[in-house]
Amino acid sequence: MTNSRFTVTYHVRAAASDIEARAQGIAVEQSVEMPLAAINDEAVLSDIVGTVEGIDDIGDGLFAVRIGLATATVGQDAGQLLNMVFGNTSLHNDVILQDIAVPETLAQTFGGPRHGIEALRFRLKLHGRALTGSALKPQGLPTEGLATLAEHMARGGLDFIKDDHGLADQPYSRFAERVAACAAGVARGVRSTGHPTRYIPSLTGNLDQLREQAALAHDLGLDCVMLAPMICGFPAMQALVRECPDMAFFAHPSLGGAARIAPELLIGGLFRLMGADAVIFPSFGGRFGYSPATCRRLAVNARRSDDRMKAALPVPAGGMTVERTREILDFYGEDTMLLIGGNLLMARDQITRETERFTRAVANHNLG
């Protein structure tokens, strides 16, 4: 049995007099989940039981607790990784999963992005500026309306047009007909502009449905899809990424706030580890509550390339506006896709003109 370990950091709110016992409790809970006195196998005690590697007082009753967990307990299963690092401990409402030092063995197992930032840029033949994107919405709009909207947005020169994450396989717009129609709408826009805008359908459902939808997207000539890892599950995402090597995967953060996992780890780190080529997240200053510091750490984690995995594209979203283009890109930098949805849609019949204004603002950003 190997004794290779990786370090997991938790933020624990506790009294100073209790923190050592709390840390030891997490180490046991996230490994063998039983009284150590009941274990008589020396290999289990030495190689499997979690170890407390350090405790730091970070103020205001909060402690950073570092636990060493056995790499062998993860195997090759994405779900088991989550189970081992936060399974039962997630049931304690005073603990946050803050960071995971992913060892090379697990990085190789899960693989990270198959394409990453550079491949996305290559597909668009685009370098030297940030990328642009928007979303097809609202749900409830019939297929023809979504397809027309997709065409008008594409005529504005966007790099990516994605489904809103609320679009699924619904009676008023079935997945197969919607994706075919929206892909055709984007293609018409591309013929008008000459710019290779990508359409990103949202995949939903169980694994069989996800596979069918990914296959349909592939058959339509699409090379990007979106899914919500916290909805479909990490194992399903892991399977799709492996089975669809030509597809670039955009990860949506829906339900990401329910797990008490630090956003910079969950969205910027774990989504990337599971194969997301681009990670969508709610940026500061929009309609969600992430701070600038959290957003910066998330983007840094997504763009890492020092761990033998490719860099994923950060996609700040969630109430962004055209007027904030310079501010947002000054903050995140060039290797970013700025996603603006509702603010563009406010233009209604002038959506193409407003989209052109957005794409010009991004193109002009690096010109000073």
At which residue positions do the language-model features occur?
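N-terminal capping/small domains of soluble enzymes
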Residues: 1-154
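Structured C-terminal cap/extension of enzyme domains
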Residues: 1-9, 13-17, 22-24, 300-305, ...
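Active-site mouth loops of central-metabolism enzymes
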Residues: 10-17, 130-147, 197-209, 253-263, ...
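Alpha-helix-loop-beta-strand connector modules within alpha/beta enzyme cores
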Residues: 30-31, 45-49, 175-201, 234-255, ...
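Active-site-adjacent beta->alpha loops and helix N-cap segments on the catalytic face
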Residues: 113-123, 167-189, 207-210, 229-245, ...
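Gly-rich Lys/Arg/Thr-decorated short loops/hinges at beta-loop-alpha junctions or inter-strand turns
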Residues: 129-133, 160-165
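Catalytic domains of carbohydrate-active enzymes, especially glycoside hydrolases
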Residues: 148-164, 221
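Catalytic alpha/beta core domains of metabolic enzymes, predominantly
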Residues: 212-215, 220-340
